[in-house]
């Protein structure tokens, strides 16, 4: 028996329907992304790429500020946060209703994105293996389901 929760996820208080495929469009704000054509640096480039993602039918914009390509430059947590702040400020201004995911493997970066910009999805390519605080951070910002609240 399927339950309602198996087809939806809570994204900042709204349900995102996953009973049908949901495409996630990638927005790289790194100067050294694997694919040169995906490197967005200016407000105009970021805005245009976000609009393209949505126009092509994606339900989620996944923004990343740390390249995962082989031999990519190591970026400090501070630099990753500054890049994301710039990108997220642009997205919140130009596409306020868009569902935003942040691609990071760092718990501190994820925390900043949730606290300062209300990001509801964290996309960690390392699945918590590169930062032992990632699971704790995600759990801290996960709303309990009504069923879990009843058990407390």
Locations of the language-model features?
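N-terminal amphipathic alpha-helix/helix-capping segment at the start of soluble metabolic enzymes
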Residues: 1-28
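Conserved, mostly hydrophobic/aromatic
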Residues: 27, 57, 122
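Active-site mouth loops of central-metabolism enzymes
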Residues: 31-45
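Glycine-rich, proline-tolerant flexible connector loops at the mouths of alpha/beta enzymes
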Residues: 34-35, 61-83
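Active-site-adjacent beta->alpha loops and helix N-cap segments on the catalytic face
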Residues: 75-83, 108, 128-139
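Alpha-helix-loop-beta-strand connector modules within alpha/beta enzyme cores
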Residues: 76-100
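Catalytic beta/alpha-barrel core
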Residues: 99-105, 120-129
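Conserved small/polar residues in nucleotide/adenosyl-binding loops
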Residues: 141-148
């Amino acid at each position: 028996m399927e339950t309602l929760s198996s087809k939806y996820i809570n994204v900042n208080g709204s349900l995102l329907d996953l009973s049908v495929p949901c495409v996630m469009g990638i927005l790289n704000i790194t100067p050294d992304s694997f694919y040169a054509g995906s490197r967005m640096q200016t407000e105009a480039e970021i805005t245009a790429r976000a609009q393209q993602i949505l126009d092509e039918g994606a339900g989620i914009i996944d923004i990343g500020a740390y390249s995962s390509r082989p031999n990519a430059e190591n970026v400090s947590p501070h630099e990753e946060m500054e890049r994301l702040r710039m990108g997220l400020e642009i997205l919140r201004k130009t596409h306020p209703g868009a569902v935003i995911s942040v691609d990071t493997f760092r718990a501190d970066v994820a925390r900043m994105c949730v606290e300062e910009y209300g990001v509801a999805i964290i996309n960690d390519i390392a699945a918590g293996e590169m930062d032992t605080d990632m699971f704790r951070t995600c759990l801290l910002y996960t709303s309990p389901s009504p069923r879990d609240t009843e058990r407390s």
